[in-house]
A protein has these predicted regions:
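Membrane-embedded alpha-helical segments that form the functional core of polytopic membrane enzymes
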Residues: 1-42, 73-80, 138
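Helix-coil boundary and interhelical linker segments in multi-pass alpha-helical membrane proteins
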Residues: 1-14, 54-74, 115-134, 177-181
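Residues within membrane-spanning alpha-helices of integral membrane proteins
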Residues: 13, 17-20, 52, 76-79, ...
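Hydrophobic transmembrane-helix microenvironments that flank and shape a buried ionizable site
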Residues: 20-23, 41, 45, 80-83, ...
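Juxtamembrane membrane-interface segments at transmembrane alpha-helix termini
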Residues: 25-32, 84-92, 196-208
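Multi-pass membrane catalytic core of lipid/isoprenoid biosynthesis enzymes
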Residues: 32-87, 116-118
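C-terminal membrane-associated helical module and adjoining short loops/tails
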Residues: 98-217
């Protein structure tokens, strides 16, 4: 948040990514050391609101929102509010690690926003193509996805075998060569996958109900 307010946007972005990595480790460390507690769960949620709600919202505001008046202030505010709602819903509906998430996870939402900023820092899309409104609109859509009922896959219980291990190694190699572009494609693809899967399910349900109705008539 401090780096974003001072205009050091690249460092602010990488710190958000570091927060996501550490967030994936803290629960496992607590279980391995047998130090998991209800207090830890609630405190972790508070940390998530700050790291993945407030921090990316401030990054978004100081990077682009500050130039768009009330609209530029509203979108980051909505991001924080919907992110907090997403975490609250997760805490009351999840008793164990699920195979999927209901709504886009707030860490993923935060990383998508910060990757858009990183890409713009590299290619100057806002400066050259007036990309600002697109970024604000995209961030608003990301906020909506956090509180939606769209299911996103969870990789916490992924079955590790030789093929998956090799795939992860190759993926890490690609990320190492082109970290910004690769991560942006992967995370944006994750967001789009949930939407496409939701649309396919809706089409299947409607088609199935139509077939059933036709058979009954």
């Amino acid at each position: 948040m401090i780096y974003a307010s001072k205009g050091n946007f690249e460092m602010a972005c990488w710190l958000i990514l570091a927060s996501m990595i550490l967030d994936g480790l803290d629960g496992r460390v607590a279980r391995l050391t047998n130090t998991a507690s209800k207090f830890g769960v609630e405190f972790d949620s508070l940390a998530d609101v700050v790291a993945f709600g407030v921090a990316p919202a401030m990054l978004l505001y100081f990077y682009i929102g500050i130039d768009y008046g009330r609209l530029g202030a509203c979108v980051p505010a909505i991001f924080v509010i919907f992110g907090a709602v997403r975490l609250a819903r997760f805490n009351i509906t999840t008793s164990s690690e699920p195979n999927f998430f209901i709504g886009l996870p707030i860490p993923s939402a935060a990383v998508v926003v910060m990757l858009w900023v990183l890409i713009d820092l590299e290619y100057k899309l806002i400066e050259n193509y007036n990309y600002g409104y697109v970024m604000l609109l995209g961030s608003f859509i990301i906020s909506i996805l956090m509180v939606s009922n769209i299911r996103y896959p969870s990789f916490k219980k992924m079955q590790w075998n030789f093929k998956s291990f090799i795939a992860v190694i190759l993926l890490l190699g690609i990320v190492y060569v082109n970290p910004r572009e690769t991560l942006c494609v992967l995370m944006s693809g994750y967001v789009v996958y949930g939407i496409l899967r939701w649309l396919v399910l809706i089409i299947k349900v409607r088609f199935s109900s139509k077939l059933t109705k036709d058979k009954n008539t």
